């Protein structure tokens, strides 16, 4: 959400970052039909939502992290897919291509939006111009593939897009690059809740002091 917000800001769009990160949605003022809202919304919020509808919806993955809250996997998947169920035929959805549960849900339902299946193998030619170490991990690389697909759909300026991505340093304390040189990169991942949340970046690095 944060990198998409930064990209749209650099493109001189009127953009607001709200939801789980950023400001409360109802606190935003002076909005227009051209205002972009980048919303990080949880499955908990989606579960109870009856009127929320996004023109651009993103489902990065389906994990078992929130099963305790939703009681079972079916309830969790249904909550996530309210994003797509609330869309119309002028909306767009971006989902992980090789996720079994996501593909299964799409096959069983007739969603109205245009659905893009995204993976790192089909990143566009712009990816060759990127040199940001933040995206070295599999997880962040996957996030980047979604960003590039969304940017293409929005027809953003490619030069500004590349600059925004190359300058992105991540959220504070979450795989945040705080120093980078030829021989040393220092990454602050102190907000990690455990080994599992750091595993993606660790397995893509060498000579690690953790």
PLM features: what roles do these ranges have?
Residues 14, 133-210:
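Nucleotide phosphate-binding/pyrophosphate-handling subdomain across enzymes
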Residues 25, 31-131, 135:
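Flexible active-site lid/hinge loop adjacent to a nucleotide/diphosphate
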Residues 13-25:
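Short beta-strand-centered segment that lines the nucleotide-binding/catalytic pocket of NTP-utilizing
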Residues 1-3, 24, 41, 194-198:
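Short glycine/serine/threonine-rich phosphate/pyrophosphate-binding segments
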């Amino acid at each position: 959400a944060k990198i998409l917000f930064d990209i749209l800001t650099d493109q001189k769009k009127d953009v607001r970052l709200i939801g789980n990160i950023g400001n409360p949605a109802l606190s935003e003022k002076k909005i227009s039909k051209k205002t972009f809202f980048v919303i990080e919304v949880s499955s908990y919020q989606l579960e109870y939502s009856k009127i929320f509808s996004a023109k651009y919806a993103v489902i990065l993955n389906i994990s078992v992290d929130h099963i305790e809250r939703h009681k079972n996997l079916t309830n969790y998947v249904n909550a996530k897919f309210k994003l797509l169920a609330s869309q119309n035929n002028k909306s767009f959805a971006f989902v992980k291509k090789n996720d079994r549960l996501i593909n299964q849900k799409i096959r069983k339902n007739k969603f109205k939006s245009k659905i893009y299946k995204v993976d790192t193998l089909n990143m566009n030619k712009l990816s060759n111009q990127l040199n940001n170490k933040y995206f070295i991990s599999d997880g962040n690389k996957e996030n980047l593939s979604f960003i590039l697909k969304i940017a293409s759909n929005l027809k953003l300026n490619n030069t500004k897009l590349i600059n925004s991505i190359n300058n992105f340093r991540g959220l504070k304390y979450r795989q945040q690059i705080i120093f980078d040189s030829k021989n040393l990169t220092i990454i602050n991942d102190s907000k990690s809740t455990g080994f599992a949340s750091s595993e993606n970046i660790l397995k893509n690095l060498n000579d690690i002091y953790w």
